[in-house]
């Protein structure tokens, strides 16, 4: 239906942005903030009528500049890619938690149907933050294969071999998924209000240091 009563706001006191609008007689609000304590972006979508939130969420990059989209369970998708030869691998995950209704993963989408409220959690990571751990994993993999001719080729190519690159990419994705899942589990283990309160408290320790007027 048509959208009306559309408003956008940025609250500098809380470091949160929100949007409100009406559609088909239902009033919706969407609030988003980047939480340093939770290490993730949190988005809350609410309405004033039960069971009226239906949405599809996905990641996109220009010209499909990513390697693929995986799933973690039925409520989380992970977009992943790399920056080319000798570059870092990256991944970003999206988790949906719905009060009422249902959440399912269809292809590259998370689909929420008939919810009262939806909280989305966005977490990103790259192998720059876990270089040593990835190197250790690859060293162990090569050690396991060192007796084979293929392993010898991998070592001699020092990362230029296609098989090595594939193996390293798979290891990087596994590592990044695990790191992001820990962050998502911690965030989802708290209520939305707890996450918001912790975010505001952390932010105001910096924001409230200075007060000036013009």
Identify the residue ranges that each predicted region occupies.
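Aromatic-residue-lined binding/catalytic grooves and analogous aromatic/hydrophobic interfacial grooves
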Residues: 1-214
